[in-house]
Amino acid sequence: MRQQQEADVVALGRKPGLLCVPERFRAMDLPMAAADALFLWAETPTRPLHVGALAVLSQPDNGTGRYLRKVFSAAVARQQVAPWWRRRPHRSLTSLGQWSWRTETEVDLDYHVRLSALPPRAGTAELWALVSELHAGMLDRSRPLWQVDLIEGLPGGRCAVYVKVHHALADGVSVMRLLQRIVTADPHQRQMPTLWEVPAQASVAKHTAPRGSSRPLTLAKGVLGQARGVPGMVRVVADTTWRAAQCRSGPLTLAAPHTPLNEPIAGARSVAGCSFPIERLRQVAEHADATINDVVLAMCGGALRAYLISRGALPGAPLIAMVPVSLRDTAVIDVFGQGPGNKIGTLMCSLATHLASPVERLSAIRASMRDGKAAIAGRSRNQALAMSALGAAPLALAMALGRVPAPLRPPNVTISNVPGPQGALYWNGARLDALYLLSAPVDGAALNITCSGTNEQITFGLTGCRRAVPALSILTDQLAHELELLVGVSEAGPGTRLRRIAGRR
C-alpha cells in the first residue's frame, strides 16, 4: 500500500514526506461538540460514518490531458493546509476519555491527497465502481479525517475529484459550502486554492448548516434540550402518533414496512449517481400543481418500487421516506434555494409505492407532503423539532446501538436535498459538470439518496450497503425511466391517463 502511495506521489511530481506547517499552529486540543463525538462513538468497521462528494470536471480548451494533475501538484508544492483540515480526533486519560480535536503540526499530504486512474476506455460504470471502493473504508483516526482523490481517465479527457470527510468534522451541507468557496464563475481565473487550503468559516466549523436530513442523532439530541416546548409537544405528538398509527402515514409515522432496505449493514459500499435537467422536473411540477421536491420523491418512489419488484420484495404498504423540512416556514429544503440556517426538522412522507401509476403516485406524494407541512405549520419550532426527533428516533438509536430496537420501525430511506451553487462554475479553468453528494448508510437504513442542484441540473447521489442494496445502477436507470413517464404525461396535455402511454406496471 505504501509503495502505491509513493508511486502516486511521484506521479504528482513531488517527493514523499510530511508537510510541516508554521510553528504558531503547534498542537492544541479544541473541544468537540457532543453531537459530533457521537459519530466517533457510533462508528465501526462495518458502519463507517463519513460523507463524500464527487465532482466531475471538464478540462479547459487549452489544457492538456494532465492539466489538473499539474494544478494539484502545484497546490501541494505551496505546502498550505488550513487549520480546520489539520484537526484529528484525540482522547486521553486527562480528558476522561472524552473526544476533542487536536490540531496537527505536521500533515502528511502524501497520504491525504492521492491520484487514481481509470483503465483505458473506462466509462461511468468504472468511475462509480472505483468511488464505491474509496467510499467504503474508514478514515484513519490517527490522522486528520479527510481524503482527496484526483481520478483521471474519464471519457472526453475529463477528470473527477472525490472528497471524503468524517461526519464528526463536517456533513454534506458543510462540504458543499466548502466546495462553493473554491469555485468561480470566471473560466479564466487561475491560481485558485484547493479544498484543504481554504479556512473553514464559522458557519462550517461550528456546523450551523442544515443537518436534519442526515443527522438523526443530532436532531434527537438537540430536541431534548428544548424544554420550553415540552408541554405543548406532548399533546401534539400524542395526536400525531395516534393519526399515524391509524392511517399508516403522516409526519410521524410508526408504520414503515420492513424491506431489504432496513436490514443491518455490512462494510462494503455501493454508490451511484445520475443527473437530469431541472427544466424537465419543473415541467412535470407545473403540470401536476406540485413542487420540484414532490417530483423528486415521486421519481424515487417509482424507482424503489421497480427495484423491489425485481427482487420480489415489494411490501403491500407504501414505503416511507424521511425528508428534511425547514421549520422556519415549513417549506421543504429546495435544492435550488438557500438553506434557512439550522431550523431543520424532518417529515415522514409516503412514497406511494403501492400505486402502479406514476401519476397517481405523484398525486399521493404531493398530498402526503402537504398534510405533513400542515401538521407542523401551527406548532412552535421546538414542538415541530420534537416531533421530527421522535420520527427519526429509530435511526438515531440504530446508529448509537448498532441495531434497531424492536418494535421501532424506521423509515425505509432518507431522501435529502442540499442547496447547491447555480450557474456555470469553474475551478482553475476546469468546468464543474456535475457534483454528487454521498452519505453514510446505517443499520436499519441501508440506502441514502442525496440530491443537489448545480448549473440548472439536479444530481442524485445514491449510497448503499452493497449486501443489502446490490446493483444500485438499477435504481439510477429507473429514476430516468420514471422522469420520462412523468414528462410524457405533461407533454400529452391535461387529463391524459398515464396507463394509455406506458401501460400498467
From Swiss-Prot:
Induction: Induced in response to low levels of nitric oxide (NO). It comes from the Bacteria. The keyword Transferase applies. Pfam families: WS_DGAT_C (PF06974), WS_DGAT_cat (PF03007). GO terms for molecular function: diacylglycerol O-acyltransferase activity; O-acyltransferase activity. InterPro entries: Acyl_transf_WS/DGAT, CAT-like_dom_sf, O-acyltransferase_WSD1-like, O-acyltransferase_WSD1_C, O-acyltransferase_WSD1_N. The keyword Membrane does not apply. GO terms for cellular component: peptidoglycan-based cell wall; plasma membrane. Keywords: Acyltransferase, Glycerol metabolism, Lipid biosynthesis, Lipid metabolism, Transferase. Pathway: Glycerolipid metabolism; triacylglycerol biosynthesis. Signal peptide: none annotated. GO terms for biological process: biological process involved in interaction with host; glycerol metabolic process; response to hypoxia; response to nitric oxide; triglyceride biosynthetic process. Belongs to the long-chain O-acyltransferase family. Upon expression in E.coli functions very weakly as a triacylglycerol synthase, making triacylglycerol (TG) from diolein and long-chain fatty acyl-CoA. Has no wax synthase activity. This is Putative diacyglycerol O-acyltransferase Rv0895. It comes from Mycobacterium tuberculosis (strain ATCC 25618 / H37Rv).
